[in-house]
Each structure stands twice: as structure tokens, then as C-alpha cells.
UniProtKB/Swiss-Prot annotation:
GO molecular function: hydroxypyruvate isomerase activity
Transmembrane segment boundaries: none
SUPFAM superfamilies given in the database record: Xylose isomerase-like
Function field: Catalyzes the reversible isomerization between hydroxypyruvate and 2-hydroxy-3-oxopropanoate (also termed tartronate semialdehyde).
Enzyme class of the recorded protein, top EC level: isomerase
The reaction(s) this protein catalyses: 3-hydroxypyruvate = 2-hydroxy-3-oxopropanoate
Name used for this protein in its record: Putative hydroxypyruvate isomerase
InterPro entries on file: HyI-like, Sugar_Epim/Isomerase, Xyl_isomerase-like_sf, Xyl_isomerase-like_TIM-brl
Keyword Isomerase: yes
């Protein structure tokens, strides 16, 4: 086994960002990849004009790549925010306005994974109130995902880089997954296992894989330290992905790493060109 046996997709919100958004799908295809994922591309608008949605849809289709993952609206990301769904007031309303927009866009491209970032803790607001709001919004998102045959992803981030984000361990994210599934009865909420974030939290990655592979709906990787390409840090990513496969995970692996100072297309030397197209 090894990297060549995985199904990789390129995150176009962190790779190829030296290019305009609409040029990134073709750049990923030119590098040999056949699948991409995105954070919500319109950070200032949960409900962009239909013409903007159509332009991105066309760029993805014209490039001949598959959209395999999409984030719901998450506030200013890139930026200080880490989601909107647990933020009382305007941000929660913006998330709700985005739910069907994101789900319909995903459905139009055959995308079957929607990621809902939880949101930062807000000073002066009871965490229990934020958690109640989060569950309400995640239930709505799970139902929208179910409507299009998709899974709803819940992601743990890392405390050093996201100190106000409450889900900074695998068990914390899994607890939310379980609460959402219990509330909806749909069973379509899944864990987004980001090996970079979990390693930054100091978690035992083999133990996390063994415990939670069955509840995992998507995996993302970057090396640590540095959040660079595999081989730039010290994480045994090839071994960890093999362990995931042996534990039963056969889904996508998102490349969510920083390309460094060189153009993104030069950051894939760790993966033979013939292994980049999904099989």
C-alpha cells in the first residue's frame, strides 16, 4: 500500500491560491488530479449571485474535475473566523441562509460531502447557549445534506492555531457527530479527520484512527510542523493512511496543505503523476 493507493483531492482554498478562483480547477487538472474540494469561496456572502455560482460550476465542469467536498459558509475564512453556526445573531442567520444554497450547489456538481465548521466561542456568551444553537443549525444542515444524498462533516481543528474553537480533539468532534445523529435519526453526520490538526493537538493518531475510522466521512492531510506537503515535516502520513485503509476507510483524502514559496503545481513531487487521478 502507500500514497499511490489513496484517492486524493486538492483543496482549492489553500492550494493554487496564487491563481484566481475560476482558474484553479483547470490548474488542478493540469497537475494530474481529477477531484477538488473547497472552503466556501465567498467569505462575504452566504448567498452569492446565481451568476457567481454558475461561473464556478462551469469552471469545475470545464476542467473535467469532480467536486468532492464543500464547506458551508464559515465567516471570514481564511481569516479570524472558524465557522458561523454557533455564533448567535447575524452569523447564525447567515449560516442558515447558506444551507440550501450550498447544498443545491453541491448537488449540481455531484458533491456528496458538506463540512460545517462549528465556530469560535464568543466572549460573554454562555457556551451552553452556543452549543444549543449549534445543534439546531447542524440538524438543519444534516437534513439538507440528506436531501441531496450527502454526508455532513464535523471537523476538529487545533488549539494553538484556533484557541477559541471548542472542538480541538477527536472525541469532542465525535461527541457532536453523535448528538446530531441522535437528534436527526439520519445517521449522515460524520467526522472529518484532519491528521494535521489532530497532530497539532498532540493526539495519538494511530489510536484516533483505530477508534474513529468507522465514523469518519472524510480525511485531510498536511505535514507537521509547517502544514506543508507530505515529506516536509515529520508525520508518517503514508503509514497513517495505510492504517486508515486497513481500518475500513475508503473515502477521499483531501490535500489541505500550504505549498510553500513555489507555485502550487510544484508541491506535488511527493506523489507520482500517475497516482494523482482518482481511481
Amino acid at each position: 500500500m502507500g500514497f499511490a493507493d489513496q484517492r486524493f483531492n486538492v483543496n482549492l482554498s489553500i492550494l493554487f491560491t496564487e491563481l484566481p478562483l475560476l482558474e484553479r480547477p483547470a490548474a488542478a487538472a493540469a497537475a494530474g488530479f481529477t477531484a477538488v474540494e473547497l472552503w466556501w469561496p465567498w467569505i462575504d456572502s452566504p448567498t452569492p449571485e446565481q451568476s457567481e455560482l454558475d461561473a464556478l460550476k462551469s469552471a469545475i465542469e470545464d476542467a473535467g474535475v469532480q467536486l468532492t467536498g464543500l464547506n458551508f459558509y464559515a465567516g471570514q475564512l481564511p481569516g479570524p473566523d472558524r465557522g458561523a453556526l454557533s455564533i448567535p445573531g447575524e452569523e447564525s442567520e447567515r449560516f442558515r441562509a447558506n444551507i440550501d444554497v450550498a447544498a443545491d450547489f453541491a448537488r449540481s456538481l455531484g458533491c456528496t460531502a458538506l463540512n460545517a465548521l462549528y465556530g469560535n466561542r464568543v466572549e460573554g456568551v454562555d457556551p451552553a447557549e452556543q452549543d444549543r444553537l449549534a445543534l439546531e443549525n447542524l440538524v438543519l444542515a444534516a437534513r439538507a445534506a440528506d436531501r441531496i444524498g450527502a454526508v455532513l462533516l464535523v471537523e476538529a481543528l487545533n488549539k494553538p492555531e484556533s484557541p477559541r474553537y471548542p472542538l480541538v480533539s477527536a472525541p469532542a468532534a465525535i461527541a457532536v457527530v453523535d448528538r446530531v445523529n441522535e437528534a436527526t435519526g439520519l445517521g449522515n453526520a460524520k467526522f472529518l479527520m484532519d491528521l494535521y490538526h489532530l497532530s497539532m493537538n498532540g493526539e495519538d493518531l494511530p489510536q484516533v484512527i483505530d477508534a474513529y475510522a468507522a465514523k469518519t466521512g472524510h480525511v485531510q492531510i498536511a505535514d507537521n510542523p509547517g502544514r506543508g506537503a507530505p515529506g516536509t515535516g515529520s508525520l508518517p502520513l503514508e503509514d497513517l493512511l495505510d492504517r486508515l485503509a486497513k481500518a475500513g476507510y475508503d473515502g477521499w483524502v483531501g490535500l489541505e496543505y500550504k505549498p510553500g514559496d513555489d507555485p502550487s503545481a510544484q508541491s506535488f513531487s511527493w506523489l507520482p503523476a500517475g497516482a494523482r487521478a482518482a481511481r
